[in-house]
Regions:
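Class I S-adenosyl-L-methionine-dependent methyltransferase catalytic core
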Residues: 1-172
Length: 172
């Protein structure tokens, strides 16, 4: 028998559906990307939600400034137009293509998101590569027992090759 939660997730179509990132995982994510941060970088949380990312930024990134958007506060990520140096957040998985496109338009040197592992496709990696961003690091984790694996991914212009290799040959 399928769980009601799993069924609800599969049927959701509202991009405002949210699942907040547990604070301990936020801290792991921020430590995971710390090496990409330069002094004075503007670090951006495009999906404030409960605020766990934005509120934790100053604990990990001590010489930086921060900004955020949150639709519930009247600050829409898709209308944000300031340039940033780094994006670190947990976007809505249902809108990942639009999120990646908008993220690139903000011209950061590094984009790091917590995404569902099924969102990490060859096509999306190739899209990021074609825009000068390479998958430099990944960290797989189980956020919720009722949801599959998720991945912290780091796409950066500071690298010139992906940390994984793949081919799109259909063998049979």
């Amino acid at each position: 028998m399928a769980s009601k939660i799993n069924t609800d997730i599969k049927k959701r179509s509202n991009p405002n559906d949210v699942f907040y990132t547990p604070l301990p995982l936020v801290k792991i994510h921020l430590e995971f990307v710390k090496e990409y941060v330069d002094e004075g970088d503007i670090i951006f949380d495009g999906f404030y939600g409960s605020g766990n990312y934005y509120k934790t930024y100053p604990e990990v990134f001590t010489t930086n400034t921060f900004d955020f958007t949150e639709i519930e506060m009247g600050k829409d990520f898709f209308e944000y137009d300031k340039k940033v140096n780094m994006i670190v957040s947990n976007p809505p998985y249902s809108m990942i293509d639009k999120v990646l496109e908008k993220s690139i338009s903000l011209e950061p040197h590094t984009i790091s998101y917590l995404i569902g592992q099924n969102n990490l496709t060859c096509k999306r990696i190739e899209y990021m590569n074609s825009n000068g961003y390479f998958l430099d690091k990944m960290y797989f984790t189980k956020v919720f027992k009722w949801f599959g694996m998720s991945a912290i991914v780091v796409f950066t212009k500071k690298s010139k090759k992906n940390c994984i290799e793949f081919d799109r040959t259909v063998w049979k």
